[in-house]
């Protein structure tokens, strides 16, 4: 954890770096953290998105479900064009677009 943040990380996470309780040391911990989200639905979607935006290093997603029309209004990673696709596949693709540095 001795590596310093690179220029891109400093720019991306600048608002977190100024927080007293996070700073560079905390951000490095976030970047090296691993999370498993079981269920990419009404709670899993926003949790995954916020964790990726915060800079979590690795996120695992588990959900055997497909996207239905009834999911669209409450599961922010999915749109109408995603109906009948795997929740995990679509969520992983969208999360990579948000932060390509996070391993999904």
Where do the model's predicted regions map?
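Adenine nucleotide-associated cytosolic modules
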Residues: 1-104
């Amino acid at each position: 954890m001795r590596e310093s943040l690179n220029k891109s990380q400093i720019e991306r996470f600048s608002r977190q770096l100024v927080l007293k309780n996070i700073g560079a040391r905390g951000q490095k911990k976030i970047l090296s953290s691993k999370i498993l989200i079981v269920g990419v639905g009404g709670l899993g979607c926003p949790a995954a998105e916020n964790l990726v935006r915060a800079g979590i290093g690795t996120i695992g997603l588990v959900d055997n479900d497909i996207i239905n029309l009834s999911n669209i209004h409450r599961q922010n990673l999915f749109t109408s064009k995603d109906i009948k696709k795997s929740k995990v596949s679509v969520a992983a693709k969208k999360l990579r677009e948000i932060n390509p540095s996070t391993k999904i």
